[in-house]
Amino acid sequence: MIYALILAGGKGTRLYLLSRANQPKQFLKVINNKSFLVNTVERITPLIKKDNIYVITNQDYLSKIRGELSDVNSKNIFTEPENKETATCIGLSAIKLLKKDNDAVMVVLPSDHHIEGQKAYLDTLSEAIEIANRRRGIVTIGINPTRPETGYGYIEMGERIPSGAQAYKIARFTEKPNIEVAKDFLLKGTYLWNSGMFVFRADVILREIEKYLPKMYKSLMNIYQHIGEEDEEEVTREEYGLIDGISIDFGVMQRTRKAYVIKGDFKWDDIGSFNALSRYLNEYRNNKISNNVYIQDCENCSIFGGNEKLIIGFGVKDLVVVDAGDVILVMDKDKDQEIKHLLNDINETPEFGAFI
């Protein structure tokens, strides 16, 4: 059977201030007055029925997710004792689904992307499901790049495989290149953006975890033996303490020989940075601004105003300004991808850590 797994435990730190620890990005209402999480569930429902839609998150967000997704069975919401990156949360979800269904196929979706082109999106995932079953492959969805983007990973397309879609073996992955490399990838035309969406059988991904992450696999199998038992939560917590967290890209996808990519013919945006989010603000004389902003003689600025005060920009350029009420961020636009390092430093400063 086909199951959707929605990854909803991240904190969205690159959108700091708009996305906070207590209100991360997946709960933001940016596009249509619905949260990214709700849009993700509604988008996949025509392909996968609600009973087969699962969400994995951490304990801090459990009640918030139950409130957002009141029509999703609470038993379908998995929680992790701590964040150990995507390979771990996918592995944990895989053993839980495999326990109930030996033929489980997982459609893994981030909870915080914006997608337009519903039919093409569902058709692409349907083709990925077919390849995952027929070839026992690990399939990811690639997006045709429209600009030299340094905030995304890239996938080089290899040999095309017989399929109704544009499906290829993966030649290699490149994680977030610099601007010159990104420009070169765009010109070559053989590279796709890595969307972070995956399709695979639960048993296949677990075999690949066993092969490339044997220590993690051992912990997952120990948890598997206790699923449904009284001590499941305790064992999960203990085994998570032994796991070295790693992303599914670094841990499995860049190593496996079972990797395929399908080119998705739909509009996709990972609104994971202020530069990305500014594409959805109002255009004003080569600037992007929200409500409660007045600017004059400014160039290439993105200004996110709050509800209680007016932000005035005068004679500045290449800035991101964010008003979150208790914190105001002023940042050079070129630092967009470096904000995680800044937040780590602030978090280690006792008098400021509470603002993260």
What are the functions of these language-model segments?
Residues 83-88, 147-149, 179-181, 268-269:
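A short acidic, often aromatic-flanked loop/helix-cap motif at beta-alpha or helix-coil junctions
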Residues 113-115, 145, 268:
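Short histidine/acidic/glycine/proline-rich micro-motifs that form metal-
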Residues 118-230, 234-237, 260, 308, ...:
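Conserved core of the sugar-phosphate nucleotidyltransferase
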